[in-house]
Structures are given as structure tokens and as C-alpha cells.
Amino acid sequence: MLDKVKNVIVVLSGKGGVGKSTVSTQLALALRATGHKVGLLDIDLCGPSVPHLLGLEGRDIYQCDDGWVPIYTDESKTLAVMSIGFLLKNRNDPVIWRGPKKTMMIKQFLTDVKWEDLDYLIIDTPPGTSDEHITVMECMREVPCNGAIIVTTPQGVALDDVRKELTFCKKTGIKVLGIVENMSGFVCPHCSDCTNIFSSFGGAELAQLAQVPLLGTLPIDPRVGVLAGSTASVLNELADSSTAQVLRSIVQHLDGLTALPTSA
């Protein structure tokens, strides 16, 4: 039930291990920190990490007459979360499902969750281009979707997979809002200098080639890693960090596209 959702943003990645779920989670927290009501939907059925990243493991979801009730992280209901991780008894339990069952579950997530009034719904998808992605895109035809943010890393192999993701978006008719290059350098925890430990500028070159915006480059920052397992936003806890600056810029970019006001 997305009738109360103003904007839907899909977060994609060409391959696993690029930090897509971390970017999705921190983007949702950044949007909330700037005054928006946000939903975060984790449809990575085989590797749901959002409950862990937000410290929500062990929470139970319930059904009401209108569908599943998402997990709220605060009494004001400014951040609502839904993930298959809440349906698993143990985080280490594998999800061994064939395609049709995965498709059915994703459709349920997109149609049977009772989202309240939301400014943004962030959808964290599995890596690659699979049945799950096709299901999401088919469901999005019935609901206005603003577009996709693609997360990559500077390495060549990751960029090759992003090219496939861009082609997928083009063929399925979803607009690419921009590219985020994650793990772009390492921030020293002692002096705060950033050192490029992988290739550099790959995300910028790919964005230029695809003629889409480069939304920002996020470094590996150990201080950000410490926030995992909580609902603390980088914008509040590390306000002067380069990660916070990039996330703030992405929020402003999205608000500019959707004409939603951002609070200070």
C-alpha cells in the first residue's frame, strides 16, 4: 500500500559488497534528520542486512486488517522499516526459495505493508539484475517511482557491473537519478586525511559516460562504521565529516527533484 507515499527511490548495485545497504540506511537516516518521514524497505531476500545495520534484530512485525505493520524506530514514527529479516527466527537462517516464491514475497512487501504518510520510501534491493528487480519494476508501473540511485565502488570490476545496471534501468524504463561511488578512499582515524586505496574517479567517468549525475563519493570512514547497529545519523553524529557532507548534498538533490522542503 503505497498510496500514502509521496516519493519512491530504488537503490541498486551491480554487484554485492559495495555497501549498498549501508548507503540505503544512512540515506534514510539523513532524510529523517532533515525533517522528512521516511520508510526503508529491504527486499534483499537472501541477504537482509537492514535490521542489523539499524540495531532492530529480534523485533517482531504484526499484521492488522490493512496489512503488515512496519517496525517504527521512534514514537513519532519518522522512520518505518520492513525487511524479511524480521520474519527469520535466526539471522543465520538461509532463505532457500525458488524464483516464484521470491516474486510473491516482494509483491507482498510492495502491496501489503501498511505505510503511513511518508515523504520518501527507500527500497534497498539485492545486487545485480534478477527476478527480484524485474518484480519491483513491474510493481512500480502501478505506483509513481522517482527513479534509482546506483551504488558502486571505484574498482573496474564493480564499474563493469554498473554498466549492466544502467542498461537494465534503460530497458525497464526506470530513471537513473545518479551514481554514488562508495569506498572512495580511506579516512585515517587519527589525522582524518583521505587516501585512495583503490582506483579513483571511476564513478565520475561512468556518470559522465551515462550522462547522469555523480551524487557524491563516500570514503571508508571507521567512525561511520561505529554507528552500525543504531539509528544514529551521520548528519547528527559526524556533522563535519565528508560522509555527512555528501549525504546532505544527496538529500538536497532529491528534495530539488521532488520539490520537498529540507529543514536545517
Curated annotation (Swiss-Prot):
- The record's free-text note on cofactor binding: Binds 4 [4Fe-4S] clusters per heterotetramer. Contains two stable clusters in the N-termini of Nubp1 and two labile, bridging clusters between subunits of the Nubp1-Nubp2 heterotetramer.
Statement: the UniProt record of this protein carries the keyword Ubl conjugation = no
Name the Gene Ontology biological process terms.
iron-sulfur cluster assembly
Q: Which InterPro entries match?
A: Mrp-like_CS, Mrp/NBP35_ATP-bd, NUBP2/Cfd1_eukaryotes, P-loop_NTPase, YlxH/NBP35
Q: Which of this chain's residues are annotated to bind ATP?
A: G14, K15, G16, G17, V18, G19, K20, S21
PROSITE patterns from the xrefs? MRP
Q: Which family does it belong to?
A: Belongs to the Mrp/NBP35 ATP-binding proteins family. NUBP2/CFD1 subfamily.
Which cofactors are reported in the record for this sequence? [4Fe-4S] cluster
What is the role of the protein in this entry? Component of the cytosolic iron-sulfur (Fe/S) protein assembly (CIA) machinery. Required for maturation of extramitochondrial Fe-S proteins. The Nubp1-Nubp2 heterotetramer forms a Fe-S scaffold complex, mediating the de novo assembly of an Fe-S cluster and its transfer to target apoproteins.
Question: Can you say where in the cell this protein is located?
Answer: Cytoplasm
Q: What is this protein called?
A: Cytosolic Fe-S cluster assembly factor Nubp2 homolog
GO cellular component terms? cytosol
Q: Name one GO molecular function term.
A: ATP binding
Origin: domain of life = Eukaryota
What organism, scientifically named, is this protein from? Answer: Drosophila mojavensis
Q: How does it assemble?
A: Heterotetramer of 2 Nubp1 and 2 Nubp2 chains.
The positions annotated for binding [4Fe-4S] cluster are C188, C191
Q: Keywords of this protein's UniProt record, alphabetized?
A: 4Fe-4S, ATP-binding, Cytoplasm, Iron, Iron-sulfur, Metal-binding, Nucleotide-binding
